[in-house]
Amino acid sequence: MVVYNNTPAAVMALKKSGIQTAADLSGKKMGAPVFDAGRKAFPTFAKANQVSDVTWISMDPPLRETMLVRGDVDAITGFTFTSLLNLEARGVKAEDVVLMQYADHGVKHYGNVIIAHPKLIEQNPQAIKQFLAAFTKGAGEVIANPADAIQHVKARDGIVNTGLETRRLQLAIDTVVNSADAHQDGFGRLNPGRLALMASEVSDAYGTKTRIDPKVVWNDSIL
């Protein structure tokens, strides 16, 4: 089941850097942890936007936005609902950030999904169907009332900043969960042609030993 109909990955730069478009990233220093999803998929972004000669600077996640603010790097990759709020916490106004979401720049990858083991699918598909039905019901309630959903999180983790996390959740809902594509395909479902293109691009970006077969990784018989 697809949860994030679009990848939350994005490139972010400060307007004062002079970077305005994806083409401006050529020859620049970019920063992200080595395992960052946006960094891993950047070859696809670069190909779609004719970006070349990027130098990568690696850092631990807590330093990513700090290094951008300090000018140690020209741009960063990260999830929108993480890095945008982290930049704000470091004194950067939203209007001073150049945001290039992968989904808006030729990289229509799916994001987080629910994965089931093939053995479980074969032996107990009904249990998966019931779980997905419960998840879908809960997701609908969260989308309808994000603030109330965060209160449930707060009840289990008292140090949660409800204002900040409500904004983060709403940003995630608006950009990757309750998107136009999700409305078109249906919550939890996907477009086979789009998945096939993504599989090919991911195979190229990650240098997989074998090509990814979309028919092997997607099973909608239990949705």
Per-region residue spans from a language model:
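Short, glycine-/small- and polar/acidic-enriched structural segments
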Residues: 1-60, 65-70, 74-81, 100-102
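Structural motif detector for alpha-helix initiation sites
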Residues: 21-22, 192, 214
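Predominant activation on well-ordered alpha-helical scaffold segments within soluble catalytic domains
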Residues: 43, 85, 196-199
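Class I S-adenosyl-L-methionine
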Residues: 43-47, 88, 154, 203
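Short, surface-exposed acidic
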Residues: 53-56, 94-97, 159-173, 208-216
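Pocket-lining segment of extracytoplasmic ligand-binding domains
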Residues: 63-66, 70-161
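Secondary-structure end/capping motifs
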Residues: 123-205
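Conserved C-terminal helix/tail region of periplasmic/extracytoplasmic solute-binding proteins
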Residues: 195-223
